[in-house]
Amino acid sequence: MQEKIPDLKQFRKESNRHVLVLEAQVSEQDKYKLIHLSNNVLRTAGNDLTGVMKKNYDQLVRTKRYRHLQSLYGKAKKAKRDKELKAVGAEMKQMQEEYHVTWEFCRQSMIRINKQYHLNSIFALTQAEDVWKGVEACLYREGKTLHFRKYGDH
């Protein structure tokens, strides 16, 4: 059993969710409630959080200092200067904390938003993880902006 634990940890690290498929007999009214929850309530709560994080991210990127740090980081990465890379990375991380573009702020914001929508905490945390993945794409990869979910999108 102990030898399978590292494999399980690696699997959990690589996959963001576990899906369990069950067959159930559900009444039409319960089906309507489930669809309403997934399409409307979860989407609007996620869009509220996306709006908060988008505002903070846009304010961060708008600063000259952060854009300058991004260019320095790119130059240091190309030249493979690890010391400079760490210093610039630490300064960028500190600015992200100042402008509240962190996973912890995203999670705490979703907790506040969840008080309005009364979602199950697992659903709320899942929405926060989805939004944070978008923020990470903008911060650390080639993402340009955060996008809201439209009605009917999955």
Where are these regions (language model features)?
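Nucleic-acid substrate recognition interfaces
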Residues: 1-154
